[in-house]
Regions:
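Conserved SAM-binding loop of SAM-dependent methyltransferases across substrates and taxa
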Residues: 73-86
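Short capping/connector residues at structural and topological boundaries
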Residues: 41-42, 50, 83, 126, ...
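Conserved beta-strand/loop positions that form the S-adenosyl-L-methionine
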Residues: 69-71
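Class I SAM-dependent transferase core
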Residues: 1-63, 67, 97-100, 104-114
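Residue-level preference for alpha-helix termini and adjacent loops
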Residues: 35-36, 49, 74, 120, ...
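S-adenosylmethionine
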Residues: 86-90, 94-192
Length: 192
């Protein structure tokens, strides 16, 4: 699939393309009725998948457990779960129709490494987590405050931000910023 060419440097699982296509079809179908995403075309879904997976090209290592806060239609959590089947991905989405979609995707694609939680991150029982991901939820300080019970001395945050990322990072010292188009990917280490 040509749209995956930007990820050629990363060895995706053999079933990735077929599962990504199935995810795209499910999202476009569900979205017609339930309006859970701004992605209304195959091309838009593919771009959201690429956006979700771009960190594969710069992350040095991936942990065994990740939480995605405010998963919405599944970005970035579902694409990361497809690309990294060895990683347990917990999707936190409090809005019922979006969470129902995430449950559907998990079931239809047989994603045994995905756990869907229909609740806010601060309302759930915390567990140690090596990576916190989030895209378009809230500002960095507020997000990390919401997730504080999950943070250990080795927890990192991978945040998908827009053009104002630098403003949100004031006061943080141990982070790396990567850019692709209008997206700023922020990897924050040593959260404690």
């Amino acid at each position: 699939m040509a749209w995956l060419d930007p990820l050629n440097a990363y060895p995706l699982p053999a079933d990735f393309a077929s599962k990504a296509e199935a995810y795209s079809t499910l999202l476009l179908t569900y979205n017609k009725t339930h309006n859970i995403s701004g992605a209304k075309t195959t091309q838009a879904v593919e771009e959201n998948i690429l956006d979700s997976l771009y960190p594969l090209l710069f992350m040095e290592a991936w942990p065994n457990r990740c939480i995605d806060i405010g998963s919405g239609a599944g970005f970035p959590g579902i694409p990361l779960a497809l690309a990294l089947p060895q990683m347990e991905v917990h999707l936190f989405e409090p809005i019922a129709k979006k969470s129902a979609f995430l449950h559907l995707v998990k079931s239809e694609l047989g994603l045994t490494n995905v756990v869907v939680k229909t609740e806010r991150i601060e309302a759930t029982e915390a567990f140690p987590c090596a990576l916190i991901c989030s895209r378009a939820v809230t500002n960095t300080k507020a997000l990390l405050s919401l997730a504080k019970a999950f943070i250990t001395p080795t927890t990192c945050a991978l945040l998908y931000k827009g053009s104002r990322a630098n403003e949100e990072l004031e006061g943080f010292s141990n982070y790396t910023l990567f850019e692709r188009n209008q997206r700023r990917y922020v990897l924050v280490k040593e959260l404690m």
